[in-house]
């Protein structure tokens, strides 16, 4: 395997991984669990300091196994019973007794959450104290990327700044990667080298089934399924894509105790990169090898596009994740590379106005809408229809991706600020 392809696999294995619950509150849970481990006993008080963007994405989403919403319960539960060795699955084995103990800490005013001014989009600092010691853990740049630990005010760990950071914000820096090179890698790599990506199907389809079997959030997936059964809507590939993607997001945002295979720090975006591709593969009876190659396009393509702008911005990442999914769907349908590029262009043209106003139950609607856009855009591309140069869409897909990055990075910070202020008011 050439060295560039090895880098691609390292990227995928670094940011396409299982995550239990929305990754922003889980970030606080993880930091709190590490702080408790440093203390050697359960804390008596917990102070949580987070960036505006992490605050935004934690306000309205349920924390798995708790039945509750927000950063306070996430941090308290992580401190009381979290497993610091489990990363994004830190709360996988939390018990009802531990949740009740965490809630008691909150009820007694022992857990305080504050916003902290920082240039980092992903930032969380937790200070946990007991009668004897104080432990402080700082995460910055990635949901589990610890950059500093302090015990009783003394630094006991700091991330070596000379080492490459496994940050979601810099994952593609210095890597020779384009849509064309992703396509070549996906279609030419040895199957044995990429088949690990198939776990995405197992996890995210299980999450979708959970969302169909049980009531979570807005029940977007269940509602569409019920109306098909009533005859109000027709069953089709398009409806299957909408139902399963929405149901998976319903379950995830509603606190289901099943992990999602995340993409670039987001479970919803992992769903958006996975389920439409699975449904397209099922329709064409694609084998595991074909599906794995399609997953490489959707997951690595999404990572590449999103590397052009900061994580947790005012832009909904599902909008461009679905563009990469559309690329993969064209491939599964027997389309050409040029048609796959057209699918990306079409999707971005359709979804580029979608904002992020925090992680919550309505994400299921955005995930479903993005998935439907991927399907629509793939069909247009397969029939040789591509949007012309207009708006943020350029003649070349690479320039379009750069335009999206510019729009978000330069044009949307004020929008993000206003969204956060509205939510906090």
From Swiss-Prot:
<dbReference type="GO" id="GO:0080146">
    <property type="term" value="F:L-cysteine desulfhydrase activity"/>
</dbReference>
<comment type="similarity">
    <text>Belongs to the UPF0597 family.</text>
</comment>
<dbReference type="InterPro" id="IPR021144">
    <property type="entry name" value="UPF0597"/>
</dbReference>
<protein>
    <recommendedName>
        <fullName>UPF0597 protein VFMJ11_0655</fullName>
    </recommendedName>
</protein>
<dbReference type="GO" id="GO:0019450">
    <property type="term" value="P:L-cysteine catabolic process to pyruvate"/>
</dbReference>
<dbReference type="Pfam" id="PF03313">
    <property type="entry name" value="SDH_alpha"/>
</dbReference>
<dbReference type="InterPro" id="IPR005130">
    <property type="entry name" value="Ser_deHydtase-like_asu"/>
</dbReference>
């Amino acid at each position: 395997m050439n060295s560039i392809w090895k880098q691609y696999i390292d990227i995928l294995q670094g940011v396409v991984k299982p995550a239990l619950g929305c990754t922003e509150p889980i970030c606080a849970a993880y930091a709190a669990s590490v702080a408790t481990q440093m203390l050697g006993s359960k804390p008596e008080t917990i102070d949580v300091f987070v960036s505006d963007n992490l605050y935004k994405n934690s306000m309205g989403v349920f924390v798995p196994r708790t039945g509750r919403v927000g950063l306070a319960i996430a941090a308290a539960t992580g401190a009381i019973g979290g497993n610091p060795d489990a990363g994004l699955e830190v709360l996988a084995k939390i018990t009802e007794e531990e949740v009740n103990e965490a809630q008691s800490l909150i009820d007694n005013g022992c857990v305080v959450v504050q916003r902290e001014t920082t240039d980092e989009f992903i930032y969380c600092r937790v200070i946990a104290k007991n009668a004897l010691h104080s432990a402080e853990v700082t995460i910055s740049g990635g949901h589990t990327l610890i950059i500093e630990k302090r015990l009783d005010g003394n630094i006991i760990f700091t991330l070596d700044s000379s080492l490459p950071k496994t940050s979601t914000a810099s994952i593609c820096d210095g890597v020779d990667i384009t849509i064309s090179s992703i396509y070549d890698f996906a279609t030419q790599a040895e199957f044995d080298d990429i088949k690990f990506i198939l776990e995405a199907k197992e996890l995210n389809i299980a999450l979708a089934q959970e969302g169909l079997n049980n009531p979570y959030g807005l029940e977007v997936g269940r509602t569409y399924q019920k109306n098909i059964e009533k005859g109000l809507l027709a069953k089709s590939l398009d409806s299957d894509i909408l139902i399963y993607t929405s149901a998976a997001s319903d379950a995830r945002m509603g606190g289901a105790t099943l992990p999602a295979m995340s993409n670039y720090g987001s479970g919803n975006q992992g769903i958006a990169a996975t389920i439409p591709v699975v449904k397209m593969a099922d329709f064409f009876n694609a084998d595991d090898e074909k599906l794995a190659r399609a997953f490489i396009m959707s997951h690595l393509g999404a990572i590449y596009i999103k590397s052009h702008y900061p994580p947790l911005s005012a832009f909904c990442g599902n909008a461009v994740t679905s563009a990469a999914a559309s690329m993969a769907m064209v491939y599964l349908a027997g389309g050409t590379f040029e048609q796959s590029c057209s699918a990306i262009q079409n999707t971005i043209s359709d979804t580029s106005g979608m904002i992020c106003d925090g992680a919550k139950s309505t994400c299921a609607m955005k995930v479903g809408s993005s998935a439907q856009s991927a399907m629509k855009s793939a069909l247009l591309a397969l029939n040789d229809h591509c949007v012309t140069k207009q708006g943020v869409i350029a003649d070349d897909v690479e320039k379009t991706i750069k335009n999206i990055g510019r729009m978000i990075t330069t044009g949307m910070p004020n929008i993000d600020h206003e969204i956060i202020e509205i939510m906090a008011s």
